[in-house]
Amino acid sequence: MKTPITEAIATADNQGRFLSNTELQAVNGRYQRATASLTAAKALTGSAQRLITGAAQAVYNKFPYTTQMPGPAYASSAIGKAKCARDIGYYLRMVTYTLVVGGTGPMDEYLVAGLEEINRSFDLSPSWYIEALQYIKNSHGLSGQVANEANAYIDYAINTSL
């Protein structure tokens, strides 16, 4: 799994050298931000159910047809609503994983790689997930560096969903 630290190590190793001062400074910077990232991951995990429920409702409010259209891609039934919440939860989990490792590797490997194909196959609109992620970003209740760390990965998820 790629993280800024593993990438720096891989580059140095491929070139048969020790980490440069610049690379060591980047690694040190990551460790300095790690506490904020772990705090954000813990807070998002602790608030996951509230955030997922609120995000799903934000999607239904902005796109009311999602609760009125029949079919497996819509939330017109309890099963459809459960699928929507499950998918939002998956995005939120990926955000927490990226926070823990300090890089987009988990999201790139487990989410982004097949996202377009999944959305197309199941006729899912990226705008639904963008709305859900915006809700999470605006409602997580984090502040300072903790919020900055979380928001960076939420924004990454939003931008890769486009």
Swiss-Prot record:
Look up the record and report any one GO term of the cellular component aspect.
phycobilisome
- Any coiled-coil regions, as ranges: none
Q: How is it modified after translation?
A: Contains one covalently linked phycocyanobilin chromophore.
Residues the record lists as binding (2R,3E)-phycocyanobilin: C84
Give the residue range of the signal peptide.
Answer: none
- Look up keyword NAD and say if it applies: no
Q: Which UniProt keywords apply?
A: Antenna complex, Bile pigment, Chloroplast, Chromophore, Electron transport, Membrane, Photosynthesis, Phycobilisome, Plastid, Thylakoid, Transport
Primary location class:
plastid
Membrane disposition: Peripheral membrane protein
According to its UniProt entry, the protein's GO biological process terms are: photosynthesis
* Cellular localisation: Plastid, Chloroplast thylakoid membrane
Q: How does it assemble?
A: Heterodimer of an alpha and a beta subunit. Dimers further assemble into trimers and the trimers into hexamers. The basic functional unit of phycobiliproteins is a ring-shaped hexamer formed from two back-to-back trimers contacting via the alpha chain subunits. The trimers are composed of alpha/beta subunit heterodimers arranged around a three-fold axis of symmetry. The phycoerythrins also contain a gamma subunit which is located in the center of the hexamer.
Q: What does this protein do?
A: Light-harvesting photosynthetic bile pigment-protein from the phycobiliprotein complex (phycobilisome, PBS). Phycocyanin is the major phycobiliprotein in the PBS rod.
The record's comment on protein family reads: Belongs to the phycobiliprotein family.
Name listed for the protein in its UniProt record? R-phycocyanin-1 subunit alpha
Species source reads Porphyridium purpureum (Red alga)
Name the lineage.
Eukaryota, Rhodophyta, Bangiophyceae, Porphyridiales, Porphyridiaceae
Q: Which gene encodes it?
A: rpcA
